[in-house]
Curated annotation (Swiss-Prot):
ATP binds at G630, P631, N632, M633, A634, G635, K636, S637. InterPro entries: DNA_mismatch_repair_MutS, DNA_mismatch_repair_MutS-lik_N, DNA_mismatch_repair_MutS/MSH, DNA_mismatch_repair_MutS_C, DNA_mismatch_repair_MutS_clamp, DNA_mismatch_repair_MutS_core, DNA_mismatch_repair_MutS_N, DNA_mismatch_repair_MutS_sf. This is DNA mismatch repair protein MutS. The keyword Ribosomal protein does not apply. The gene is mutS. GO terms for cellular component: cytosol.
Length: 877
């Protein structure tokens, strides 16, 4: 059996403790991986797989990544579902030798990298939160706790098992913590649905008594009463989250703000299907482009962008909150010059939250200190812009949070250079004049370098070799270098008595002298001394910043609020949006409403302007349901979605794309539009539709807004009609909510005559010579046909198929009018015989074309030409 080397024995011991993670084992300038880790990482990273030695008679697979580029490789591995344990050298090889000639460099895991515990800019999306979530059940209660360790946000709320899916859809976390069996297995399908990595923890992590102690230690308090009254399940979820952070960060806990308790009735409830169907933050293809967020996001700071996405996912139901946000927008619109100045200052503001988090976890550097300095400088300028003005509450509060950092800003301004390096070990980030000991060490170091230049000139004259150079590398230090031709006389007396041979390369020979070695020692000592002073000063400055971390987090929140208010005001002004009226009623009256994403796309493509439409779903009591009929491609789905989006925008405190909008607060937003299957879970398109419809009928209350599109279309005609009919009746009688119901089942329109609160709407079209023109106007009334054949023709079906479809449709409609049996008709139709190809249809000519052919321009007077133009316009209608 092959003897295991001391280094490999150390590796195997560490790996055993982190069996479920890839081990990044530090060896000099590389992180090396061995055995199965190497095989998996090489495939995931597309890097070379090599071997190093043998273990139990087999070659040991090995691969590695350079330390300086490790972040990029880490990101790839995390995105592919791996967890990575980072094992660093805790001492230098020289220090290890002091313990014995055969001692292995001491190593230890300093961090476990998982999807929910990322902090580096390179591993995160600057404009999105990265939430770690813990779910706990204690007796009959359950709770959800979530934190973003890169910003310090920390929240908790009670949640029932049925409400877990909508909340996960709202938060879109990167990792979900649950207790091991049986909850882990029970929630695995849900986590898979949301594509969230699921991490099991032992029961001890979820112990609520231990959790309370953990939280008190974290916040250095004797009791949590100052933060609120927490249920046992809430304590359990928070405690598990803190315990996991302690495990992954190896005892270096992040700066978490005091936990904010949230209530279910605080925000509009939106389930996962509705978020997906409305494309709030991601399009159906999973991209940011094409989503509502991509169209309305005009924020200029990462913090403002994160706040916007958070608001979009959690529209408020609190009228005071909504009105405060709208008042802030009113102010920014009325004071457009001030708002523009604020946005200009905000553009220069770094990400304070994430800089603070890295400093707290000891992963920061001088640039994070500079980010705090620059951010505080901009905060001071922003507060000065608003000084002396009568401000609305939200903006006044945000500006007040930016003051009181004069001492810290002065310290950082004095201590740091303008553009510091990324890492403290690089040195050169402390400004001259800040520390006298540092200035002295630097002067000695720099003077020594000047002496080197003079020494090179002296040696060139002494040897008579004009091309002689003094150079430096990390192996030899300073050395004298000359060509092999010139080196001959330096290798022989008398010069050999002064110049000591060090190394010969292919083209060069290198020497040193006693004088040069002594000078190098002085320079090296001075340089090392200067770097040690800088590192000490870095620790001191970091400590000064972290002492004010809580206030800095509040200031960062204030900057984000200002960014979001000015961004939404800029959007409203540029897009001609209106201020919505939001109250506790069940009103829903929108005039000239538009779909923000579709309107944006039409404008970008240079197409026709968006056709605005009204929507009135107001109801004092009982249901208010609008039954929408009309052909495909007419804009029914767009109309449904735009009214849902207008509601959502109003309740995040934004202006809305309409001429006017009066909206009674919506408690729940449900959307059943579009068609998709779920092959992984064995669900057909129709089954998915029914599951989503069931959720709506079982959950919607009388303040909900429901939009339903084509219920029942995925099955046989009478089955589908029956389901749609019963669904509409249930919405009317039981849910008693506000709803838009689009359908091709024209039989449903008869319900408007029998059910109070149900009215018919239709999307107008115009027929001309067998073709259909979509007007995209929603009017009162019901459609009597769907124009499916015309839409098929527009889609490019072969002319023979379109013609055959017209024949079949005409005969089916005739049979229905005459009361004939459908089967007899079908038997008469040669449906399974191929129709012969039809000749291409003759091009249609309009009356205007005929008139144009009869015109002789040279024979017309100007007056006759003008009259003819009016006639042509009339004929073209």
């Amino acid at each position: 059996m092959t003897t295991v080397t001391p280094m490999m024995a150390q590796y195997l011991e560490i790996k055993e403790a982190y069996a479920d993670a890839l081990l990044f084992y530090r060896m000099g300038d590389f992180y090396e991986m061995f055995f199965d880790d190497a095989v998996a990482a090489a495939e995931a990273l597309d890097i070379a797989l090599t071997k190093r030695g043998k273990h139990e008679g087999e070659d040991i697979p090995m691969c590695g990544v350079p330390v300086h580029a490790a972040e990029g490789y880490l990101l790839t591995l995390i995105r592919k579902g791996f967890r990575v344990a980072v094992c660093e050298q805790m001492e230098s090889p020289a220090e290890a030798k002091k313990r014995g000639s055969k001692s292995v460099v001491r190593r230890d895991v300093v961090r476990l990298v998982t999807p929910g515990t990322l902090t580096e800019d390179a591993l995160l999306e600057a404009r999105r939160h990265n939430f770690l979530v813990a779910y706990a059940e204690v007796r009959s209660g359950a709770a959800l706790a979530w934190a973003d360790i890169s910003t310090g946000d920390f929240h908790v709320m009670p949640v029932t098992r049925p409400r877990l899916s909508p909340e996960l859809a709202r938060l879109a976390p990167s990792e979900l913590l649950v207790v091991d069996e049986p909850v882990f297995q029970q929630l695995r399908p849900l986590a898979d649905d949301h594509r969230i990595p699921l991490t099991p923890l032992g029961k001890a992590s979820f112990d609520s008594m231990a959790a309370e102690k953990r939280l008190c230690e974290l916040y250095k308090v004797g009791s949590l009463e100052g933060f609120g009254t927490f249920a046992r399940a809430e304590l359990s979820a928070m405690g598990a989250l803190i315990d996991y952070l302690d495990i992954t960060q190896k005892g270096k806990l992040p700066l978490l703000q005091p936990p904010v308790q949230e209530a279910e009735d605080r925000v509009m409830q939106i389930d996962a299907a509705t978020r997906r169907n409305l494309e709030l933050t991601r399009s159906l293809s999973g991209e940011r482009g094409g989503s509502l967020l991509s169209v309305i996001d005009r924020t200029v700071t990462p913090g403002g962008a994160r706040l916007l996405e958070q608001r979009l996912g959690s529209p408020s139901r609190n009228l005071d909150v909504i009105h405060a946000r709208l008042s802030a927008l009113d102010f920014c619109i009325d004071h457009s010059t001030l708002a523009a100045d604020l946005r200009a200052a905000l553009r220069k503001t770094p990400d304070l939250d994430r800089a603070l988090s890295r400093l707290a976890l000891d992963r920061g550097g001088p640039r994070d200190l500079a980010a705090i300095r620059n951010g505080l400088g901009q905060a001071e300028a922003i507060a000065a812009l608003c000084d002396g003005l009568e401000l609305p509450g939200l903006i006044a509060g945000a500006c007040a949070d930016l003051n009181g950092f004069d001492e810290l800003l002065g310290l950082l301004d004095t201590a740091l250079v303008a553009e510091p390096p990324l890492l403290a070990r690089d040195g050169g980030f402390i400004a001259p004049g800040y520390d006298s000991d540092l200035d002295e060490a630097r002067e000695l170091r720099d003077k020594g370098r000047g002496v080197i230049a003079g020494m090179q000139q002296k040696y060139a004259e002494h040897t008579g070799i004009a091309s002689l150079k003094i150079k430096h590398n990390n192996v030899l230090g300073y050395f004298i270098e000359t060509t092999a031709t010139h080196a001959a006389k330096m290798l022989n007396p008398p010069l050999s008595e002064t110049y000591i041979h060090r190394q010969t390369t292919a083209n060069q020979v290198r020497f040193t002298t006693v004088e040069l070695s002594e000078l190098e020692t002085r320079i090296l000592n001075a340089g090392n001394h200067a770097l040690e002073i800088e590192k000490r000063l870095y620790s001191s400055l970091s400590g000064a910043v972290l002492e004010q971390a809580a206030r800095l987090n509040i200031a960062a929140r204030g900057l984000a609020e200002l960014d979001l208010a000015t961004a939404l005001a800029d959007l409203a002004r540029a897009e001609n949006w209106c201020r919505p009226s939001v109250d506790p009623s069940r009103a829903f009256a929108i005039e000239g409403g538009r779909h923000p994403v579709v309107e944006h796309a039409l404008r970008r493509q240079g197409g026709d302007p968006f056709v605005a439409n009204d929507c009135d779903l107001s109801a004092d009591k009982g249901a208010a349901i609008r039954l929408l009929t009309g052909p495909n491609m007419a804009g029914k789905s767009t109309y449904l979605r735009q009214n849902a989006l207008i509601t959502l925008l109003a309740q995040i405190g934004s202006y809305v794309p309409a001429d006017s909008a009066h909206i009674g607060v919506v408690s729940q937003l449900f959307s059943r539009v579009g068609a998709s299957d779920d092959l992984a879970r064995g669900r057909s398109t129709f089954m998915v539709e029914m599951v989503e419809t069931a959720a709506i009928l079982n959950q919607a209350d009388d303040h909900a807004l429901v939009i339903l599109d084509e219920i029942g279309r995925g099955t046989a005609t009478y089955d589908g009609l029956s389901i749609a009919w019963a669904t509409l009746e249930h919405l009317h009688a039981t849910n008693r909510c506000r709803a838009l119901f689009a359908t091709h089942y024209h039989e449903l329109t008869a319900l408007a005559a029998t059910l109070d609160g149900v009215e018919n709407l239709t999307v107008a079209v115009k027929e001309w010579e067998g073709e259909v023109i979509f007007l995209h106007e929603v009017r009162k009334g019901a459609a009597d046909r769907s124009y499916g054949v015309q839409v098929a023709q527009l889609a490019g079906l072969p002319p023979s198929v379109v013609a055959r479809a017209r024949v079949v449709l005409d005969q089916l409609e005739k049979s229905e009018r005459e009361g004939g049996k459908q089967k007899a008709l079908i038997d008469d139709l040669p449906l399974f015989s191929a129709a012969p190809p039809l000749p291409p249809p003759a091009p249609k000519t309009s009356p205007a074309d005929a008139m144009l052919k009869e015109i002789h321009p040279d024979e017309l007077t100007p007056r006759q030409a003008l009259e003819m133009l009016y006639k042509l316009k009339e004929a073209a209608r």
